[in-house]
Amino acid sequence: LKKIHRELETELEQRQNQERFAEIYQKSLPLLQEQFLIQLVRGSLTPEQMQRQQKNLSVSLDANCFCVVSMKITEESDDYLSQFSVAESVNEMLQQVCPFRAFRYLDKIIYLLLLSAPSEMIRIQKALNEASHISKHYNQVAFSCGIGSICEKLEELPASFSQAMEALEY
């Protein structure tokens, strides 16, 4: 009986540990996904690592082509609510055009656009302009965007990212 009791206790402890690890993993998943996207645009992953991480982290990047947009709030605003509001305005405008993944990188917000066709960029630019006008009018906060080139493969994202970051500096 003691042996069975120990085995049951061990089994219960293992199950509780698995549940605890699963809970920790789920809580840290958004951060892990963000780190993956940063590595992706910076070019620090092999194609095999890209595939494995997409699967492991449940990040869908299905698209015919991609483009990176970098955004920085130009006002020296410590008002977190205003910054959040600006980001939400941009998100809402972009959602009307195409799917995307947004993540923070240093003091910028990076948008990885998942495009069905390069022609969507015209609508993207219009959406960003409209979000800029809304932000200035309602939030009194301006932002700047840099847009990288369109690429067809995930491996080409670092070039688009570099261009978007450089464009933001002008």
Where are the language model's segments positioned?
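Catalytic core regions of nucleotide second-messenger enzymes
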Residues: 101-106, 133-145
